[in-house]
Curated annotation (Swiss-Prot):
Descriptive protein name: Putative UPF0377 protein YGL260W
Family, similarity comment: Belongs to the UPF0377 family.
The organism of origin for this protein: Saccharomyces cerevisiae (strain ATCC 204508 / S288c) (Baker's yeast)
Length: 76
């Protein structure tokens, strides 16, 4: 089972500014088993308020679930 996690722009900026990367209107799938989140940009179109983003630069693909939202539960 997969769950979409839509992140708030200011929250993303706060959590990822240490990487000098600002990700706006992006969505990720979060797995409760392995604790990782992966960007799945094309699936963002499921929610009308989300704008898909393409990443022209190298982005860290795996983020620990607790770094994003400890309340989120989903599975690979």
């Amino acid at each position: 089972m997969e769950m979409l996690l839509f992140l708030n722009e200011s929250y993303i900026f706060h959590r990822l500014r240490m990487w000098s990367i600002v990700l706006w209107h992006s969505c990720v799938f979060v797995c409760a088993e392995c604790g990782n989140a992966n960007y799945r940009v094309p699936r963002c179109l499921i929610k009308p308020f989300s704008v898909p983003v393409t990443f022209p630069f190298s982005v860290k693909k795996n983020i620990r679930i607790l770094d994003l939202d400890p309340r989120t539960e989903a599975y690979c």
